[in-house]
Amino acid sequence: MGGISIWNLVIIVLLVVLLFGTKKLRGLGSDLGESIKGFKKAMNDDKAKDAEFEKVEQKTAESTEQKAKEKEQA
């Protein structure tokens, strides 16, 4: 009694379609999809940059250690 039944959801969906129309809803859906794709692409680009930064940081640390060892030997 206190919950939302399937018929209540059907009526709500029909009202939304009548108010906004299918063109606006279709446009809204495609805009939302493009936004999600852009967000995922940005996250993947960020991961690639982080991995590249870690490689550079590791090389720098190795060269610093190597220079320190050379100074100790000299």
UniProtKB/Swiss-Prot annotation:
Any one GO CC term of the record: TAT protein transport complex
Pfam families found in the cross-reference section: TatA_B_E (PF02416)
Entry's localization field: Cell inner membrane
Ligase among keywords: no
Keyword flag Transmembrane: yes
Membrane-protein topology: Single-pass membrane protein
Keywords, comma-separated and alphabetical: Cell inner membrane, Cell membrane, Membrane, Protein transport, Translocation, Transmembrane, Transmembrane helix, Transport
Main location as per UniProt: membrane
Gene Ontology biological-process annotations: protein transport by the Tat complex
Transmembrane spans: 1-21
The organism's place on the tree of life at top rank: Bacteria
HAMAP family, per database record: TatA_E (MF_00236)
Protein task: Part of the twin-arginine translocation (Tat) system that transports large folded proteins containing a characteristic twin-arginine motif in their signal peptide across membranes. TatA could form the protein-conducting channel of the Tat system.
Name of the protein in question: Sec-independent protein translocase protein TatA
Organism: Glaesserella parasuis serovar 5 (strain SH0165)
